[in-house]
Amino acid sequence: MSLSAETKAKILADFGRCENDTGSTEVQVALLTAQINHLQGHFKEHIHDHHSRRGLLRMVSARRKLSAYLKRTDVARYTAMIQKLGLRR
């Protein structure tokens, strides 16, 4: 259940610092957020899919750690990213 190439390209264009930016913290958090949102729809249909739920929890944890890193290093970029993604603090 990965994201389509078009979705990834749109996220890279929206959150990347330059044209070929694929590794900045904002891009990583945005990609994880898109995957998490995609999986939430999957779990509405497949309630007992515990194997995938474990992967979802790993993604949520990774997103939380990356967000904490960005907040620690550059608060302005962190707040802009949170507002753009519509995440809670």
Swiss-Prot record:
GO terms for molecular function: rRNA binding; structural constituent of ribosome. GO terms for biological process: translation. This is Small ribosomal subunit protein uS15. One of the primary rRNA binding proteins, it binds directly to 16S rRNA where it helps nucleate assembly of the platform of the 30S subunit by binding and bridging several RNA helices of the 16S rRNA. Forms an intersubunit bridge (bridge B4) with the 23S rRNA of the 50S subunit in the ribosome. The gene is rpsO. CDD domains: Ribosomal_S15p_S13e. Belongs to the universal ribosomal protein uS15 family. Part of the 30S ribosomal subunit. Forms a bridge to the 50S subunit in the 70S ribosome, contacting the 23S rRNA. SUPFAM superfamilies: S15/NS1 RNA-binding domain. It comes from Shewanella frigidimarina (strain NCIMB 400). It holds the Pfam family Ribosomal_S15. Keywords: Ribonucleoprotein, Ribosomal protein, RNA-binding, rRNA-binding. GO terms for cellular component: cytosolic small ribosomal subunit.
